[in-house]
């Protein structure tokens, strides 16, 4: 049976949010095949919701999402390069194909984001609870960032997740 969820307005949720802020992100599963250049997309996606909300299956899907986000930037770069060509060297068939691939990949990315619930009711419960958990996470990160460089800082921050 699944563990009972912590109330988003509890002190335990605030403590978990501070732990999440100290860790900042989650490393991708080594067996999932995240492209090196897709790491910025990975970290942005992972930070989109509370770190303790990610399941192992979500992390695998997040790798696919990050790789697709990288791939769409490559396709857009190729499209811009082809669109700059003038005259007989311009390949309209390739341009049309690239545009089609971009649209299809955008749809895939949107579906993956919905599935991951960078809004998922199935993994994270009611959306009102997820909204509060995400707010707790943002508040904890802001507090950490405001106070971490102060020499006379009296706020205790966890050093390890």
UniProtKB/Swiss-Prot annotation:
Domain characteristics, as noted in the entry: Contains a helix-turn-helix (HTH) doamin that is involved in viral DNA binding.
Protein name, UniProt field: Terminase, small subunit
Similarity field: Belongs to the Hendrixvirinae small terminase family.
Subunit structure: Homononamer; forms a ring-like structure through which genomic DNA is translocated into the capsid. Interacts with the terminase small subunit; the active complex is composed of a pentamer ring of terminase large subunits and a nonamer ring of terminase small subunits. Binds a specific sequence on the viral genome. DNA transits through the central tunnel formed by the small subunit and sequence-specific recognition for packaging initiation and termination takes place as it emerges.
Domain of life: Viruses
Keyword presence, Flavoprotein: no
Ranges in coiled-coil conformation: 88-115
Entry function: The terminase small subunit binds to the packaging initiation site and regulates the ATPase activity of the terminase large subunit. The terminase lies at a unique vertex of the procapsid and is composed of two subunits, a small terminase subunit involved in viral DNA recognition (packaging sequence), and a large terminase subunit possessing endonucleolytic and ATPase activities. Both terminase subunits heterooligomerize and are docked on the portal protein to form the packaging machine. Packaging initiates by TerS recognizing the packaging sequence in the viral DNA.
Binding-site list for DNA: 96, 100, 107, 114, 128
Keywords: Coiled coil, DNA-binding, Viral genome packaging, Viral release from host cell
Region Helix-turn-helix (HTH), annotated ranges: 37-60
């Amino acid at each position: 049976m699944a563990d009972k969820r912590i109330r988003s307005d509890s002190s335990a949720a605030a403590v978990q949010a501070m732990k999440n802020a100290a860790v900042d992100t989650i490393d991708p599963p080594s067996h999932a095949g995240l492209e090196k250049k897709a790491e910025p997309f990975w970290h942005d996606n992972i930070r989109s919701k509370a770190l303790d909300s990610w399941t192992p299956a979500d992390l695998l899907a997040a790798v696919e999402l990050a790789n697709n986000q990288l791939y769409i930037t490559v396709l857009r770069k190729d499209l811009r390069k082809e669109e700059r060509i003038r005259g007989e060297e311009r390949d309209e068939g390739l341009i049309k194909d690239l545009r089609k691939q971009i649209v299809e990949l955008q749809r895939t990315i949107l579906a993956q984001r919905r599935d991951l619930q960078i809004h998922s009711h199935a993994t994270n419960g009611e959306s009102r609870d997820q909204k509060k958990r995400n707010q707790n996470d943002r508040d904890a990160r802001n507090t950490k960032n405001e106070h971490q460089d102060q020499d006379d800082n009296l706020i205790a921050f966890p050093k390890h997740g």
